[in-house]
Amino acid sequence: GDKELHVDALIARAKQLLGDADYRIVFNAGLEWCLADIRNDLHGFGVDHDSFFSERSLGTDGFVERAIGILRDNGHLYQLDGATWFRATDFGDDKDRVVVRENGVSTYFASDIGYLLSKFERGFERALYIFGADHHGYIVRLKAAAKGLGLDQARIEIQLVQFAILYRGGERVQMS
């Protein structure tokens, strides 16, 4: 929506001002800082990951492009107003979803579809998602994408969690 367009415009302006090489330096430094902060927060909750998966690799490794290709080959995409749409309503969603915007940039949903494909192509038996309760609408959307890709929906497990107040040693933990 409008937020994505605004962010895209900010990124384009930063690239214009910095140039590609300096933009990459700033981008990578910011990325590493954010990941370190996330890892630190998770560690504070007693959660340590063996590995992180880079969303960027979905594009560089071709998962998004392959997922869109599969949906296209299966007849589940159409063009409207310059954008590429997924026929999500064919699989029970309340509306069709854009996967490639008019400007040729794939949407976050397209990345989610690519990630789903990558999970199974990398040999995982199932995909487990944990969403905040405010993302409940994503369940039907993601399962629709799985069906469009020809994947077994039973191999996808989605849990919803509700926001809560956390305490450690009787003290409330600041969440943000």
Name every feature range the model reports, one short phrase each:
Residues 1-176:
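NTP-dependent nucleotidyl-transfer catalytic core
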